[in-house]
């Protein structure tokens, strides 16, 4: 299937302020997208709307073998999964073998997840930005490729996995590639390379006022050539564990060439090479 240069279709009875330009999967729906291309689906949003560029899904959704190129919206330039809107059951977004390139939004350049469980496997996120188009300026432009936020409708923590995926050349204010502030997060066998944050977390930002609401595990992953003023690769203020991972040539203008940690951090069997000004800036004992 090909979805090219669309703007708000298949809304059903939903408000005009919601929905993707190509597909809108409502609360009771189940969406399956396979071997499809989404290109130039751009929502020129106005102040106060909640639109994304290509797909909005509230129900369960599976996306595989597809391409999202140059889509744009407010929350999630390519996909927005808003399971927190569900009244009866939690939802899950599953994405595999899919490419996200040149997408943009004010918040989450490619994929925005709000209260949905998620599984992202064998995907590529390249050159996505959380600075977007339009006339609305939020307080923070987070997650160049991905943002995960909010608990489920039932106030339960969401769970998510990212595996075998590559994040390259993405840019945002906080979390150049990805930003998380809710749930149990597991990242394995993934690469974060040449991502940029203009504030904190060149590759990834993990941040929440209540540390119990966000727990992080990273295993067998690489962070190479990422940059930010603070925390060249990872910024975290929550309970985090990193194992069997590599941090190479990451840089921060101020502190934390590879990692800036302000909570409980465990690092095991990992390699740090040529990170500047120092590998880890840590306010608590490792």
Could you say what each language-model-derived stretch is?
Residues 1-12, 16-43, 51-72, 80-104, ...:
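Surface-exposed loop/turn motifs in large extracellular/passenger domains
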Residues 77, 109, 176-177, 201-202, ...:
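The feature encodes a structural signal of leucine-rich repeats
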Residues 77, 133-134, 280:
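Short glycine/serine- and acidic-residue-enriched loop/turn motifs that recur at repeat junctions
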Residues 131-132, 174:
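Alpha-solenoid ARM/HEAT helical repeat scaffolds used for protein-protein interactions
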């Amino acid at each position: 299937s090909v979805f090219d240069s669309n703007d708000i279709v298949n809304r059903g009875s939903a408000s005009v302020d919601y929905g993707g330009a190509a597909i809108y999967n409502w609360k009771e729906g189940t969406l399956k997208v396979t071997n499809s291309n989404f290109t130039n689906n751009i929502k020129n949003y106005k102040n106060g709307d909640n639109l994304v560029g290509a797909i909005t899904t509230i129900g369960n959704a599976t996306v595989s073998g597809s391409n999202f190129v140059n889509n744009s919206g407010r929350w999630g330039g390519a996909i927005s999964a808003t399971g927190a809107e569900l009244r009866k059951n939690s939802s899950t977004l599953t994405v595999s073998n899919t490419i996200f390139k040149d997408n943009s939004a004010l918040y989450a350049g490619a994929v925005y997840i709000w209260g949905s469980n998620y599984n992202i496997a064998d995907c590529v996120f390249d050159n996505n930005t959380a600075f977007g188009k339009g006339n609305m300026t939020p307080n923070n432009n987070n997650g160049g490729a991905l943002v995960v936020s909010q608990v489920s409708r039932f106030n339960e923590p969401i769970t998510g996995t990212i595996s075998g995926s590559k994040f390259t050349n993405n840019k945002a204010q906080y979390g150049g590639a990805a930003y998380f502030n809710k749930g149990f997060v597991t990242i394995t066998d993934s690469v974060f390379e040449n991502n940029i944050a203009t504030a904190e977390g060149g590759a990834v930002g993990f941040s929440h006022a209540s540390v119990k609401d966000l727990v992080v595990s990273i295993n067998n992953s690489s962070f190479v050539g990422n940059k930010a003023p603070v925390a060249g690769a990872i910024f975290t203020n929550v309970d985090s564990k990193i194992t069997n991972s590599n941090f190479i040539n990451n840089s921060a203008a101020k502190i934390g060439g590879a990692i800036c940690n302000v909570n409980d951090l465990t690092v095991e069997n990992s390699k740090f090479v040529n990170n500047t000004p120092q590998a880890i800036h840590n306010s608590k004992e490792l």
